[in-house]
């Protein structure tokens, strides 16, 4: 492996670590503020953090030219569509985390990796055999992870699974606009759009006080600065020149790190049944990202 690829791999691993630990920040934040308040503030922070990142990445990529009106229109439409999906997915996730462990939330959220190619069938995108094997394993993993001995599923797990469905839609929206608009600029817009959308239920339903926000400043700042702003920028830099399959495999470690973070920081020890579910889920995620034999032969 080349030196540049090792560096990129390290950057992507750091991204996965930041995102994995973010589940802990999201859980701790719920001790002080409501889910809409948490998301509202962190998205505004993430958008603000990305503003200087846009200038830095312009110099990094050597792109200083101005965009035409059509490009700007596509950028704004993409940012707004992504922002709507991100707000919906994140609020579902945040509500779910209130009622489940961070490890389970991390693995259930990671289902979007399997759902994206399945949803892609509606857009005439074919799925390889490994994806379908992964889907079957994921269903088995979800059974052990979410359904207890009494055949009951937790309310939090349902919300997080719904979040995974919306995150899959979010990825498809990004995929549609990513080739037509600057990724970091679009992400900056989506964060502000998500923040505005979360502001309405924040003011109507939660009525946060400054004392609550100050008490939750550490998890909110982590989620806003590191998870939204820094990690996204690191992902863009890390994926440059890196094989997409390898990149996605490294980033999928986020789910494993969320479990470890839950154990080490929150002392949330998974049951043997949940561990089996996590193993099946992670194997399914890996399978879904591996190239099929037919793809290799064409390469």
Locate each region found by the language model.
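Hydrophobic/small/kink-forming positions within alpha-helical transmembrane segments
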Residues: 20, 24, 83, 87, ...
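Transmembrane alpha-helical segments that form core, pore/gating elements
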Residues: 50, 116-117, 152-206, 234
């Amino acid at each position: 492996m080349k030196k540049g690829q090792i560096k990129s791999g390290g950057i992507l691993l750091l991204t996965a670590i930041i995102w994995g630990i973010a589940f802990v920040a999201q859980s701790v934040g719920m001790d002080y503020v409501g889910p809409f308040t948490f998301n509202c503030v962190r998205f505004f922070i993430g958008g603000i953090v990305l503003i200087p990142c846009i200038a830095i990445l312009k110099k990094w990529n050597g792109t200083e030219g101005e965009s035409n009106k059509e490009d700007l229109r596509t950028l704004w439409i993409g940012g707004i569509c992504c922002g709507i999906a991100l707000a919906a997915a994140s609020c579902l996730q945040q509500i779910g985390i209130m009622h489940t462990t961070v490890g389970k939330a991390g693995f259930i959220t990671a289902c979007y990796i399997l759902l994206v190619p399945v949803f892609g069938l509606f857009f005439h995108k074919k799925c390889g055999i490994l994806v379908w094997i992964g889907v079957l394993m994921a269903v088995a993993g979800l059974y052990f992870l979410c359904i207890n001995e009494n055949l009951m599923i937790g309310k939090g797990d349902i919300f997080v699974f719904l979040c995974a469905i919306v995150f899959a839609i979010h990825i498809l929206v990004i995929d549609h606009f990513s080739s037509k608009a600057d990724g970091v600029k679009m992400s900056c817009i989506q964060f502000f759009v998500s923040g505005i959308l979360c502001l309405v239920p924040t003011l109507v339903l939660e009525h946060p006080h400054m004392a609550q926000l100050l008490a939750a400043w550490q998890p909110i700042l982590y989620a806003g600065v590191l998870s939204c702003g820094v990690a996204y920028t690191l992902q863009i830099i890390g994926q440059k020149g890196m094989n997409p399959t390898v990149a996605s495999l490294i980033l999928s470690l986020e789910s494993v790190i969320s479990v470890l973070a839950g154990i080490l920081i929150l002392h949330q020890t998974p049951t043997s049944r949940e561990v089996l579910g996590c193993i099946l889920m992670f194997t399914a995620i890996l399978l879904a990202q591996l190239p099929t034999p037919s793809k290799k032969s064409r390469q």
